[in-house]
Amino acid sequence: TDFGEWEGLTFSEAAERDTELHLSWLGDTSVPPPDGESFDAVAARVLGAHQRIIAEYAGQTVLVVSHVTPIKTLLRHALDAGPAILYRLHLDLASLSIAEFYPDGAASVRLVNQTAYL
């Protein structure tokens, strides 16, 4: 995810720096940070890759290693959840989440934010 001018800032710092934009960003997944990428843009990119992986590796187990927002996007997709999950779901660094996607389009989330192995 490209957070643009907010990259490296804490959540509070971004809110203080761009108060109105930050509020808009929190309420609308189509709003990007300054010079950054919206959550909708991330979802389009991630779900496109998801479809390519499903097609290429049908019936196989695939490990995807990524950053927080793409993982949250895949979990959101698997749960058929709304955008609020992007702001309410915490994922630790190096955590393990497991979502299974089936040929009929169904999905199941088996594990989220597991860190016991660390």
Q: Which residue stretches match the model-derived regions?
A:
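Generic structural signal for well-ordered alpha-helical scaffold segments
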Residues: 43, 47-55, 75
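Alpha-helix capping/helix-boundary segments
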Residues: 70-71
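Short, charged/polar low-complexity linear motifs in solvent-exposed/disordered segments
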Residues: 40-42, 51, 89-91
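Phosphate-handling substructures
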Residues: 1-47, 111
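Acidic, low-complexity terminal tails and accessory targeting/binding regions
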Residues: 1-16, 55-61, 76-118
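A short alpha-helix capping/helix-coil boundary motif
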Residues: 30, 75-76
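Short basic (Lys/Arg) and small-residue
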Residues: 67
